Each structure stands twice: as structure tokens, then as C-alpha cells.
């Protein structure tokens, strides 16, 4: 190195370039050295911003200010103590560096750039600098390291705090304090190391790789986050495979060991942050052998793959070939037998990431409901303009071999017709049926027509049915028709609540499956049935999935649709009954036609109108008469208003929030006699109640009133509809998904605000009454640090633990983005610790090191437009309830009058209803979702055995697992383990 004059302890310097690439490279260089960005000014973006432009040069296009902060005494949380309060007054020298990008560099030609002074900075860890720059760094002595930055500036790093010092200075000279806080802080840090040593000493760490492959889908990031953090929690090393199978082939930097903080904020990101790519090389054995070598070199013998059927098939093939691939690697001399001995078997676990929802054996795949939500949102927008011009719109959606998106979108958007691959339309005849359906709906008063076409739609001769083919048919009808191809907008955006929840739970279960894996275990695929996470053999699921395409190619369309799950088939039949077959083809005999009442009870909830619409359309297509009881039971008592609903009344209700027929919290017991009178007057044969706990209570009151009021001897059922999800006996209520989506958007926004201001915490209050479901679910899918629910009372110990967890998070904070923190509190979690009081306690304990704010979304949680999932579920439940009423009436007809155990009622010759039995428990029921089952549960049994009447909820806390998983992923359990390790060490 040339001998240069040295400028020691420079507090401020400015360097200039007119090369943008060099500008960025220099910033990265100083970031690597530990400098932090404190200002990033862009003349074109921030020129009018007086705060950002303050202190910048007039000729700067961009300026980035980097600071190396002084070392000084820190408190228990690792935050700097103000100098006037510190017991140790020593401080190291800080430095501010201004890097400027200008139009043209102002360098005098006579200036000799070889006479540059060397700038010297103080560092307590010279070896680390050499490690970071092994080729550039030159160690001149034990206390001096020389470097050149990308602009050619000479820099030395000295271990001497001052030029006059004779011995190196350690960081303890600045950080060391005599306070108890500092001792605790260091002990906490040591506890982390102790915990890692303890976990590592018992057995060799399991190393797991996680990758995303094939087409991206919303929710993949949530799955990766769950795998990474769950793996770390269970003492594993977790690696992310970047760029899918291509990353497996390349190895090296594409296999990155992940830390806890690496996946912070990933829940709210769309796509996949670790990338995805299709690899032709991996399809060859040579490519798979190369991938095996890369995994073994990192010690990895478990792989979690999130992708479609092709990706999962490749993964399972990789597993079966693994032993022979390892033998080939040994034969090639890349590894010895001893080196590969621990890696004789490869564990594979599959997660289905696909917006098509085309995997057999699972109800939904990661990303499917997010894509459906995008479709419904777009079609809702299209409907608005279509009605204005009285147009027809043909909308093409994805689904090459699976019509799930098209079917669900058809139900959720009130489409007139759908085309799906599983049910091919008759060649040359489908045009006539399409035109007949659209013309019939127009004649009933509809102003627009919506047709949903899956991209893989075809006729029974395997000819493609395109959006333009459909358009041509509608033009023949004389309709002004437009085509909209949604394309990749369906993949875009962040994941909805359902997909975040699904990906998180499946990611956690994937790690558990890896740890439980044996060489004899078939590769598992993590799926879901109704509300329950399940495992199923990967090979069989993929085989069934591919057999659908085979059946279609063989023109066996009955087999193709039979291979879909029962829910798919049920919903397809429901769509036909409510839309296509409203031509009188399904009318029942006059003697079997019923009068069915529909009433909304309780607070407004999304999808009340969607359920009423589906029930009405199904009734009309079968000849029943649907009657809307206006304004709840109080409206019936006060005015007796009951309206017979027509097709045009409900045609546009599929995407309307609130209640079009009115709702309130009045219950049936306010005047059972008057209610019985109007039931008798309208000759009701059945009743559907939509509502929450008030609806649940009303159903019980009507059932109990059968002794005094024989008219109540009719089949009655409740469709749970409440954002609180507090109806006993069921795990799902209409409106919950809409509520959770609203909360996801709300919390994403406030977390962004918290991240922008860096050290900021929000305490968010959510609804739910005495049920902690919404709070627990929201905490899980938003990455909340803590969740306060009524089921687990808040106490000072739990608050203290949360404060410690927050301090630990912020102690390691380096000013990165995505570091806003969220705490979720149920509105009834405590009568003492209110949302504001919690915020005040945490704020006081933070001693100004981070800010705390409250956020209360209130009735925003009820949502506006119902979510696509709520719309589809509403339709499914409504049709099931009509069938329930039909079946009970059939049962009555088939029963002899002498059998008093079965509900019976008939009209006499004067048209009066004659009850023949006091009550029948099973005929008054609640439609319930429990795990993987949908069933009708008698209200009498639910009220007696499963209802906490005082707290207005069920006894079962079916969401308890969400809190446990939330504690794992937030780091709470990790912190507890560290504290326990520290306590054990102190003993």
C-alpha cells in the first residue's frame, strides 16, 4: 500500500459520482461494513419535501446518508441510554457518510487522484472486516486493516479508539454498565446461545429445505414462513431453495440458510419471495443427481415442496431415486461412503400451491380462494358497466383441466351460464341452450348477462369452447357482447385470510410430518377437508388428479366430474338448479310444493343476502314459495309484513352486504303467539333462520313453543351467520371470512404504518363478544406478537412477557422495513385491561424506546361486499336447508298418523293446518361444520349440552390450536425456552 496521509476520526465526509451503478455499488459496500441508511433523497421524488431535501446539495440527483453509530452504554433491551443518564460515559467515534449521485462529476483535470488521503475508522472487530472482504482487505497489523471502496477511496480500520492509544479497545469498554438491566440483557443473549447448544448437543440437527415450484400462487410466502419458523422452533436448520428446482440444480447461494428474521413480514406479500422456475434439467436423471449432491453438501435430507401436481410428482420421483443417486455420487468420487451415510433417505412433504384448486383429495389449495376473490372482484366491476349498457359479458378464467374457479365464480357472481372441462357441453347444441337461458333471464327482468368460461372448456367432441365462441352465440341472440380475459391478474395480489390460514397451518404440519417421517412412510401431501388439516399419500392424490384429465381425453365426462370432491359435485348441481334449470324442468308435483319462510335475526353479517338469494332461486325452480319475514321477528310482531320473493327481487343479491329484508336483535320469545298467528296465516311449511346467537336462541324458543303453538311443528333450521362465530356446535358462520378479510387489509395497513415509523407497536381491538375466534384467527394470519382472548384472562405476567418479547424484537432491530409489531385484543378479553390501558402499560414499560398506538376497526369488520368464500358457502348452506325442509315434509307424508314419534302435520279440507305431534327434536336443527363434516344438529341437544348461555357461545374452543401455533410463529415459545434455559443455567 502506498504511504498516504491519514485523516483519523473523520465525523463527516461526502463522496461523489456520476455513475449510477457505481453509486449503488458503493452504498452496498458501506452497508456491508455496518453503515445504516438514515436518509435517502431523490431529487425527482422528494424535491418539494423540505424535510428530506434539508442538508442536501443542489446539484445532487440522489443522496444517501449512511451513519456508523457510536458505541455507548445500552439498557436491558439493547437500546442506547442517553449520555446524561449513563453510568459509563465512554463513547466510540461515530461517522456520517454522504454518497452523492450527480449529472457530471466536478473533477478538475489538474487534480491528481493518486494523492488521496486515507480515511481511518475505528472498529472493535477487524477480523470480521477481513472475513467480509477476503480478497480486498489487507491486514497491515493486528490493529490496522486497509481497504479501497468501489470509488477508489482509501480506507483503514483501526482497533485503536484514538490515534494516541497504544492498545486495542474492545466494545465492552463502551457497552459495559454496572446496572442490573445490562446484566439481564447479556444473560438473555447468552440464554439464546445456551438454548441452541442444548438443542444441538442432544442430537444432530435436522436440516430441512423448503421450495416453491411451478406457477406462483398467493399464500406461498405464508407457507415458507411457517416452515422456516416452525423448523427453527423444533431445533432444525431450515434452508430456502431459491428459484425452485433450478435452484436445487445450481446449489450454492441458491440454498440459503434462513434465520427467524428473514421471513418477517412475508404474510402480507404476494407471489413467492424465494422465486419459482420450471427446470427442464431436473427432468433428467443427471439433473436430479446434481440436485442430490447439492443437498448432501449442505447436510439436507428433507424437502418441503409447495407447488402443483407436476412439481409434487417430480419431488416424489426424486425421493424414490435418492438411494441410487447417492450411490452414483459416491461412485463418481464426489462423496465418500462415510460422508453420505447419514443421508440414505430423503423425506418429501408436499403442499399444494395452485390457484386452479385441481388436486384430488383436498377441498382447497393454497392460492385458490385468493384467485377466486380477484375474479369475483373483477366480475362485480364488470357487472356495473354491463347493467348500464344492458350488455352481456363473457369472462374467461384460468383452469386448463379443472373448472373449480369457473364454477365457484359462477355461483359467487350470479352468472347465467358456465363452461367447465369436467362437464363438456353437447357439440353443436350448447349454443341453443345458452341462448335460451340468457333470453329467459332477460325476460324475467335482468339487464345484463354474465358467462364464465374456464380456459380448458370444451364440448363432448373435445373441441375447445373459447370466450369468442360464446360471444358469437350471444351476438346471434342480438346481445351487445364483450369479452374479458382476466389472465394473470388472478394470480396477483396478496393472499386472502383463508389462504394465509391454510398455508400457515399446512406449513406447520409439514414440519411435523418431516420429523415423524420414516423410510417406510409414503410421501405425505398436506390437504384440508372442510375445516380440518389432513395428510394423504402424495402419489395417490397426484394419480387421481391426473386421471381427471385422462377421463376428459377419453370423453368419459361422468367419471371426470365424479373424481372431483363431493363439495364440487354438490355445488355444480346447486348451480344448475338455481340458474340453468329455472325453466320448469325441476318443478315438483303441486302436492309437494311448500311455503318456506326466511328470516334474518341479529346483527348484520355478510352473505345474508347471498344465502336468501340461493334459497329463493332453488325454491322457485322446484315450485316452492319463498316468503321473506321483513325486519326480523320484531317486524313480524309489529306489522306482520311477509313478502313473497320473486326471481327479479333477489337476482342481484349475490354481492350485496347487510340485509335487504331487514334484521335486528329481537328474538322470537317477544311474542310467540303473534308469530304463530302469522305463520298460520301464511301457511308456512318450513322456516330458515339466518343469524348469530339471537337466531340460535330464537330457534330454541320456537322449538319449545310447539306445545302451545302447533304451527311450530314444522321443520326449522338455522344457518349460522355472525362475525363473532359464536354459534354453538359449528366451527364456521357466514360472514366470518368477510370479516377476516377486512381485518387482514386493516392490519396490513396499520403494520405498514408501524413499519414506516420503525419502532412502533399497534394494539388492535377486534369484535367477537366472549368468543376469541376472530382475535385468535386474526393474530395467526397477521403475525401478531400476542393475542388477548376471553378464554385466557389477561394478567400482569402475560403482559410482562409480551413487553419482554417486544423488547427482544426491537433489540435486534437494525432499522429494516417490515418491523412494525401488532397485538390483537378481543373486545371482551378483560373488563380491567382495556385496549387503551394495555397500550399505556406497554408504552410506559418501553421507556420511550418504541411507540405504542391503539387501532379499533369497529363495525368495519362486518365488511362491505361479501367475500367469495362466504357467497359460495351461503349458497351451499341455503340449498342444504331447503332440502332439509323437503325431506322432513316427505317424512311426514310417508308416516302413518298413529306414529307420534315423527313430526307430522297436514291441512284439513278447510285448508287449516292440523298438528299431530307436540314436537320432534331433529326437525329443529342448526347446520354445522365440524372438522371434515357438515351436518344438521338438533337445537335441543346443542342448547342442553354445548351452550354457555351466559357468555353466548359454545363450550368447545375449537380454535385453541391457532393460539398455540401463533405462539410458535411469533417467537413467544422460543422466548420462554430461552428464559427457562437461563434459569436452569443460573441454578
From Swiss-Prot:
Residues where beta-D-fructose 2,6-bisphosphate 2 binds: 760, 853
Membrane topology type: Peripheral membrane protein
InterPro entries on file: 6-Pfructokinase_euk (IPR009161), ATP_PFK (IPR022953), Pfk_N (IPR040712), Phosphofructokinase_CS (IPR015912), Phosphofructokinase_dom (IPR000023), PKF_sf (IPR035966)
Catalytic activity: beta-D-fructose 6-phosphate + ATP = beta-D-fructose 1,6-bisphosphate + ADP + H(+)
Assigned EC number: 2.7.1.11
Annotated positions binding beta-D-fructose 6-phosphate 1: 354-356, 398-400, 455, 488-491
BP terms from Gene Ontology: canonical glycolysis; fructose 1,6-bisphosphate metabolic process; fructose 6-phosphate metabolic process; glycolytic process; proton transmembrane transport; regulation of intracellular pH
Pathway: Carbohydrate degradation; glycolysis; D-glyceraldehyde 3-phosphate and glycerone phosphate from D-glucose: step 3/4
Enzyme class: transferase
Phosphothreonine modification, residue list: 450
Major place of residence: cytoplasm
One GO cellular component term: mitochondrion
Function: Catalyzes the phosphorylation of D-fructose 6-phosphate to fructose 1,6-bisphosphate by ATP, the first committing step of glycolysis.
Family indicated by similarity: Belongs to the phosphofructokinase type A (PFKA) family. ATP-dependent PFK group I subfamily. Eukaryotic two domain clade 'E' sub-subfamily.
Quaternary structure, from the entry: Heterooctamer of 4 alpha and 4 beta chains.
Protein name, UniProt field: ATP-dependent 6-phosphofructokinase subunit alpha
Organism of derivation: Saccharomyces cerevisiae (strain ATCC 204508 / S288c)
